[in-house]
Regions:
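Electropositive phosphate-/nucleotide-binding environments in soluble metabolic enzymes
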Residues: 41, 71, 75, 98-99, ...
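C-terminal helical "tail/cap" subdomain of flavin- and related membrane-associated enzymes
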Residues: 174-268
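Short secondary-structure transition/capping segments
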Residues: 31-41, 91-102, 168, 172-173, ...
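FAD/FMN-dependent oxidoreductases across multiple families
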Residues: 96-178
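Mobile, glycine/GP-rich and aromatic-enriched active-site lid/loop segments adjacent to catalytic centers
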Residues: 73, 82-85, 90, 113-125, ...
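Predominantly flavin-linked oxidoreductase catalytic cores and closely associated redox partners
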Residues: 4-116, 133, 149
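Generic detection of short hydrophobic beta-strand segments and adjacent strand-loop junctions
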Residues: 14-15, 127, 227
Length: 268
């Protein structure tokens, strides 16, 4: 049985289904009620304010996305200013309950020269930091998107992974229907992780290494100035796979990481 709430009429209806794809977001009700230990993954709480975008200023560029690594804004994640034409998103994320998200976002708006802009709306949502260990209940439920925890560490990107995760979930359900067996639900997670596990592991290791203090974040920003880092990151981001090209560049980046993580060099 699947309960659907029609928001336009507030009518609640009951649907009889053979399978349910739980795509109801982070901290999913479907996952919590059907998948063991679904609630036991870490989250970052993201908060942003959609504002009326100003004209271009010395601080605000409508053609540039700003990512802010500053412990005063977020001690364990990052803040952002993302232009969207006539509006802009200004926000931050954190996994610490002690951080006042609205106060931090207000400070970011002031810092970015956007405190006088009109606020259109305010929104907040949890962002999962790692994929769930299990996406199905072995019977009639499989998860997709944020409900399955497929948000990339470090960046918080989830749209692409939600779309491809939804496809894998749909493919798994289709195979179950064609073969009359629920065992194929496991294919959703298996196929997703086969394709994207390496990227999630690298991004998770990067977040654990560099997001823990202002000094580490400054070192991360210094690394990002390296042209090889920029090129390899761009290739990996666009193709959603770790770039295997230019092995010498990978070796150089590895040694730079070691130098920064051991304190052999200073952040610049």
């Amino acid at each position: 049985m699947c309960i659907r709430d029609s928001h336009s009429t507030k009518k609640i209806s009951t649907l009889l289904t053979r399978y349910v794809i739980g795509a109801d977001g982070a901290k999913s009700n479907v996952a919590r009620n059907t998948i063991k230990d679904a609630h036991k993954i870490p989250y970052v709480i993201a908060y942003h304010e959609i504002i009326e975008a100003p004209r271009e200023t010395s601080e605000y560029n409508p053609d540039r996305c700003d990512v802010i690594y500053n412990g005063d804004i977020s001690p364990d994640f990052y803040g952002w200013v993302f232009p969207h034409g006539k509006s802009a998103s200004v926000g931050m994320g954190t996994g610490l309950n002690s951080v006042n998200l609205k106060k931090a976002t207000s400070a970011l708006r002031t810092q970015a020269g956007l405190d006088k802009c009109s606020t259109i709306r305010k929104e907040g949502a949890p962002i999962p930091l790692k994929p769930l260990e299990r996406w199905d209940n072995g019977d009639n439920v499989v998860l997709a998107g944020d409900a399955a925890g497929v948000v990339a560490p470090s960046s918080g990107e989830g749209i692409y992974y939600a779309m491809i995760g939804g496809k894998y979930a749909a493919d798994a359900v289709e195979k179950c229907l064609l073969n009359g067996h629920s065992k194929y639900l496991t294919l959703a997670r298996r196929n997703f992780m086969k394709e994207h596990k390496a990227v999630f592991q690298v991004l998770g290791a990067m977040q654990n290494a560099y997001y823990r203090s202002d000094d580490r974040r400054e070192r991360f920003v210094t690394l990002c100035k390296d042209i090889d880092v920029q090129r390899i990151t761009f290739e990996s981001y666009m193709h959603k796979k770790l770039s295997r090209s230019r092995p010498i560049a990978h070796l150089k980046i590895m040694f730079k990481n070691i130098a920064h993580l051991t304190g052999m060099v200073k952040a610049t």
